[in-house]
Amino acid sequence: MNKCRFLSKNEEYRNIYQNGRSIASRYFVVYYLKNEDEKKLPSFGISVSKKIGKAVVRNRLRRRLKEALKRLCFEFLPGYDYVIIPRLSFKNDEFSVILEQLLYIIKLMKRSIDNA
């Protein structure tokens, strides 16, 4: 089974921010950009603002979000790179709420891409 890829380079994040599209919900802002290889699994980046809290809180949030992305990796459209930015309202929610909100944002993105 293939694993999801996570972005690691600053240039990758910058490229998605500058050239990609964004969609927002109550819990997330997601930037997405079509990559060169349409068959490739999606790549994810997670950016947690210092407004969320101190490092311990941000890292816990990042770990929970990363696990949710691993579980839902195949729900995302292949051939796209994503940067996910959790909002402050996301901080103390249960894992099931995180999964539910990610599925909701995936649905919004698919609808947005189909309309474009």
Curated annotation (Swiss-Prot):
Domain of life: Bacteria
Entry keywords, A to Z: Endonuclease, Hydrolase, Nuclease, RNA-binding, tRNA processing
Enzyme class label: hydrolase
InterPro entries documented for this protein: Ribosomal_Su5_D2-typ_SF, Ribsml_uS5_D2-typ_fold_subgr, RNase_P, RNase_P_CS
Gene Ontology annotations of biological process type: tRNA 5'-leader removal
Subunit structure, as described in the record: Consists of a catalytic RNA component (M1 or rnpB) and a protein subunit.
Stated family: Belongs to the RnpA family.
Task performed by this protein: RNaseP catalyzes the removal of the 5'-leader sequence from pre-tRNA to produce the mature 5'-terminus. It can also cleave other RNA substrates such as 4.5S RNA. The protein component plays an auxiliary but essential role in vivo by binding to the 5'-leader sequence and broadening the substrate specificity of the ribozyme.
Protein name (Swiss-Prot/TrEMBL): Ribonuclease P protein component
Organism: Carboxydothermus hydrogenoformans (strain ATCC BAA-161 / DSM 6008 / Z-2901)
Lineage, broadest ranks: Bacteria, Bacillati, Bacillota, Clostridia, Thermoanaerobacterales
Gene: rnpA
